[in-house]
Amino acid sequence: MKIKTRFAPSPTGYLHVGGARTALYSWLFARHHGGEFVLRIEDTDLERSTPEAIEAIMDGMNWLNLEWDEGPYFQTKRFDRYNAVIDEMLEAGTAYKCYCSKERLEQLREDQMAKGEKPRYDGRCRHSHEHHADDEPCVVRFANPQDGSVIFDDQIRGPIEFSNQELDDLIIRRTDGSPTYNFCVVVDDWDMEITHVIRGEDHINNTPRQINILKALNAPVPMYAHVSMINGDDGKKLSKRHGAVSVMQYRDDGYLPEALLNYLVRLGWSSGDQEIFTREEMIKLFSLGAVSKSASAFNTDKLLWLNHHYINTLAPEYVATHLQWHIEQENIDTRNGPQLAELVKLLGERCKTLKEMSQSCRYFYEDFSEFDADAAKKHLRPVARQPLEVVRDKLSAITDWSAENVHHAIQATADELEVGMGKVGMPLRVAVTGAGQSPALDVTVHAIGKTRSIERINKALGFIAERESQQ
């Protein structure tokens, strides 16, 4: 049997982490079995679906590199197909027209709740022989079996059973002629030959209804797997304050897709004690049987740790392709300075996100207008004049500009003046970077370049002289 899965988001908002994890699990299951992965946009909610949300979903899938083999399919472009199937069901007697007014249904609901009963349609029109005009408004309901039960073997949770007496005669077409979500899903899964439906646990109650419709259509019933919820680290339902933002917000905040994928795959699935997984390892090891039935807790610190790991272990050239976007957001002109791959090597240990990296690298490429006030007050004092002058001259004398030779110049200055390296290094760091923190000084000065470093040392000396004249 050829395995075929699908990810079917509703474009009523952004692609959030819960949806991204569902997409990842569906994608991994298909790839593990050499099957196919379908992207389907369930946009039947015409009032809430937006082009912006569709674009956000596609952007998120592309950024995560969860490539699909078919689609994207749009339900709004398949209304003719859905209505044709509904008409066949009306003809076969597995569906019927319901003319009950909104007022009657509301009264029925109130009466049932007053008796402590579960609100459900009472089947009045199912058994009615009243004649109605062709243009009289009506909905179409599915004639759900009235006895027996629906049992399905959830691939994560095990067997689940629902009594048909608990299930309603579901509306499958509204009065305006539009088909409803639960029906469209069934026809889509049938037409697209989906073998495994992997989705959130909030869909468990939809599953028996959808299975009954599939059986009424004599269609094959796929396997179902319902993934548990993601909670915040406080055990409460995940919300924006926990980090439940769009996938693309994580991109904007400086995360690598590899870090987010690695984090999401472990958010409910495990393979021994392994924490770090390449994409290839995820595909090889993934199984639905290893997915937890319990809710997972979202931990931003763990995600940040993974991101820092990937910044420092992926090829710098690759990380640089993602860093480029952040550099552009900061409007940094990188034509004069180190290649971005070199920047990744320089700042990788210090920066946990690419956003942080882009916001702390400007001095490598552009001159700064002023020194950090605290750093200058502490390190650009009259006592720093001589170390800066001596190290400037030694840097000027270097013919083979390298980090090693820069280090020798700094060391030689400290030796000549008989002072510790910090007496030379800290004033030099503030002089060339404008601040009191940077990567190792030799590689920093080397990356900034000989001419620019000497110019900045002279600027710092001028700053010291000006401060002296004001005292």
From Swiss-Prot:
The keyword Aminoacyl-tRNA synthetase applies. It is found in: Cytoplasm. GO terms for molecular function: ATP binding; glutamate-tRNA ligase activity; tRNA binding; zinc ion binding. The keyword Signal does not apply. Keywords: Aminoacyl-tRNA synthetase, ATP-binding, Cytoplasm, Ligase, Metal-binding, Nucleotide-binding, Protein biosynthesis, Zinc. Its EC number is 6.1.1.17. Its cofactor is Zn(2+). Signal peptide: none annotated. One of its GO terms (cellular component) is cytosol. ATP binds at K240. InterPro entries: aa-tRNA-synth_I_cd-bd (IPR045462), aa-tRNA-synth_I_codon-bd_sub2 (IPR020751), aa-tRNA-synth_I_CS (IPR001412), aa_tRNA-synth_I_cd-bd_sf (IPR008925), Glu-tRNA-ligase_bac/mito (IPR004527), Glu/Gln-tRNA-synth (IPR000924), Glu/Gln-tRNA-synth_Ib_cat-dom (IPR020058), GluQ/Sye (IPR049940). A motif ('KMSKS' region) lies at residues 237-241. It catalyses: tRNA(Glu) + L-glutamate + ATP = L-glutamyl-tRNA(Glu) + AMP + diphosphate. Pfam families: Anticodon_2, tRNA-synt_1c. Binds 1 zinc ion per subunit. HAMAP family: Glu_tRNA_synth_type1. Catalyzes the attachment of glutamate to tRNA(Glu) in a two-step reaction: glutamate is first activated by ATP to form Glu-AMP and then transferred to the acceptor end of tRNA(Glu). NCBIfam families: gltX_bact. This is Glutamate--tRNA ligase. It comes from Salmonella paratyphi A (strain AKU_12601).
